[in-house]
Amino acid sequence: MSRGTLFDKVWDLHTVATLPSGQTQLFIGLHLIHEVTSPQAFSMLRDRGLTVKFPGRTVATVDHIVPTENQARPFADSLAEEMIVTLERNCRENGIRFYNIGSGSQGIVHVIAPEQGLTQPGMTIACGDSHTSTHGAFGAIAFGIGTSQVRDVLASQTLALSKLKVRKIEVNGELQPGVYAKDVILHIIRKLGVKGGVGYAYEFAGSTFAAMSMEERMTVCNMAIEGGARCGYVNPDQITYDYLQGREFAPQGEAWDRAIAWWESLRSEADAEYDDVVVFDAAEIAPTVTWGITPGQGIGITETIPTPDSLLDEDRAVAAEAYSYMDLEPGAPLQGTKVDVCFIGSCTNGRLSDLREAAKVAQGRKVAAGIKAFVVPGSERVKQQAEAEGLDQIFTAAGFEWRQAGCSMCLAMNPDKLEGRQISASSSNRNFKGRQGSASGRTLLMSPAMVAAAAIAGEVTDVRNWLN
């Protein structure tokens, strides 16, 4: 029986059966696939003589392995080319909608689905990618799955899942200038830990989230997984509806009015029951940068790197590992740390509003000597919109490279990689060892505006000093 949260309502509406194991057989309303985790799933289908049950509920694109500097086919990387050819064939043979390079709609899977109106409140959404929680910004229940589960969704449009607990995370108050959605989620993960959300869905609530745009909410929900939560969501509201209205796959006419009435009914009740509630004050959140090897190892820009005696016992071992790997001293400031590469993009921060905020910092300034700085739009549509606004010219005039759409340096599956012990100021979502392509490369996570400021200064700096 529903406890009155959006999570419980959507879960119950999509429950096909309760399995003998106690798990729920859950219907999946939208399945997103890409070139990395889908080939084996299609092979398993063929091996078992199965077909895609509801091809109209699956949408595909290429993002992880595509180069962002030169996207001419065939790719120089023969494996990358083979993966895309395989996805093209699998989609063609199974009647699956596919957004390929040059279609005008290709991009990172978690960018293109919302911008086309595919992602809607009340949906269950699955994708073979960790950051599927992004779509929860719309009031959907969205989660990443493994390759065998991709197979299961293709074959049955359902998954066997254990129901999650629900934690309400309230942030109230107005964010300070120079503090962005990225800082909010990094602050939450810092306080609750990278394992704090294990077994939970996070409901993001409070006046701070109510004031956020959809793209800001997507940034927050995108990184719920980095705090251990399986998914994160925001209740749909007028901001959600205004974003969706008129988009290609959004309901139209009378169907639109019916949809809003239904979406409104899904919102968590005022007396909803949560497993626990955590409250934060927006005024306490500063521009935040990670110093270590997990997204939970973050500090406000004016703080110093924590010393072992200031940490909980369970955090000291990974902190010691981080001090050594990052070559940073406990008690030292992170501000002023020299950087080598500055990357703006990813499914966390590669949307139009992210590029606008970074461009405000870059405008009229120059990238510091010796810094490699580049901007990678999250989709072909974002790229087109940014160019229509002249953002590309602002970046290139400042010395940034302006690239094609793709996942880029968020992960080491394409030509955009760190080299050796380079330090990256990155707007992406993970700072694990080797994440950006070099086994010894170092990643500092921050907002796009902070990355732009680091590129200009040549070092980690407080973006508030760069805002006109």
Curated annotation (Swiss-Prot):
Binds 1 [4Fe-4S] cluster per subunit. The keyword Lyase applies. Its cofactor is [4Fe-4S] cluster. The keyword Lyase applies. HAMAP family: LeuC_type1 (MF_01026). Belongs to the aconitase/IPM isomerase family. LeuC type 1 subfamily. This is 3-isopropylmalate dehydratase large subunit. It comes from Synechococcus elongatus (strain ATCC 33912 / PCC 7942 / FACHB-805).
